[in-house]
Amino acid sequence: MTIRFGYRDVNYPSGIIGELRDSSHLLGNVPALRQQMAEDGFLFLRGLIDRQKVLKARKTVLQHLEAHEALVPDTPLLDGVMGGRSPQMMGRKGVAYHPDVLDVIESEELFRFFDAYFAEPSITYNYKWLRAVGNEEYTGAHMDFVYMGRGSANLHTTWVPFGDIPVEQGTLVMCPESNHLDSFARIRDTYGRLDVDRDLVEGWFTKDPMEITDKFGSHWLTTNFEAGDVMIFGMHTMHASTTNLTTRWRISCDIRFQPASDPVDERWKHKGTGHTAANLPVKPIEEARAEWGV
């Protein structure tokens, strides 16, 4: 099938964007999970969270969107048909902190996983990146370190789809081995040390994810996600998303977990500042890349 990746139309599955492999068979084998993370830069775990909890949370978020006139009237609520601009849902309050939503993004399944993975108690940022991504929207290629690199060296992102999300609706796309391939070393040593608030530079490495693999190697992987699936990855794994070609909101949430004993990025602590450069002029990433030689 033809999908859109950034602004390019590509075939899926193909050598350009292949199919993710499920690592859930490794659950309970922490050394194997850590090895897989070190090799690929991510873990795709199907059905880690109870599906019914996720669907309940999806309904709650859609009711919130409906109340803010972001859905087409007289269409099935659970279809999530776009009818207006999505309200802001990220943060430390509002619908992101509804008990139904917290039952997913602060679920016992996630804490149980990370407590075992870190071999110590885990904590999660209280800031929640809950999103509704609309038609023709996508996420450019980037590494998460640039947004939250001041704390734990063992910080991990967890991406949770709120419902079944086919590739054409805007799924997460991973660039395997970008966390350690030699061909990505220059990126990791320049862009990968960026702090968007300190350095006042745009956060996406490129708006054209295909540029990454064209210039630096590796490939891209995604899948049709289902409610209950999670993607877990480190701060220096390059990732992006497909473009939402549907008329339905793609609802998802990014959350972060780390060992409780590690330092926490002060921007994302309880009552932290969040991004301090949000309203300041920033250097275009193209200028920064020219200076870095990447």
What residue spans do the PLM features occupy?
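Non-heme Fe(II)-dependent double-stranded beta-helix
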Residues: 2-40, 46-141, 147-149, 274
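Non-heme Fe(II)/2-oxoglutarate
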Residues: 2-23, 71-73, 184-192, 227-232, ...
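A short beta-loop-beta micro-motif enriched in histidine and acidic residues
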Residues: 110, 143-155, 218, 225, ...
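Short, charged/polar surface micro-motifs in flexible loops or helix N-caps
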Residues: 120, 133-136, 165-167, 180, ...
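Generic beta-strand structural signal
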Residues: 120-127, 137-139, 154-160, 170, ...
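Short, structured patches in soluble enzyme cores that scaffold and shape functional sites
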Residues: 129, 143-145, 160-164, 176
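Short, conserved beta-strand element in jelly-roll/cupin
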Residues: 148-167, 224-227, 232, 256-259
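Double-stranded beta-helix
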Residues: 167-237
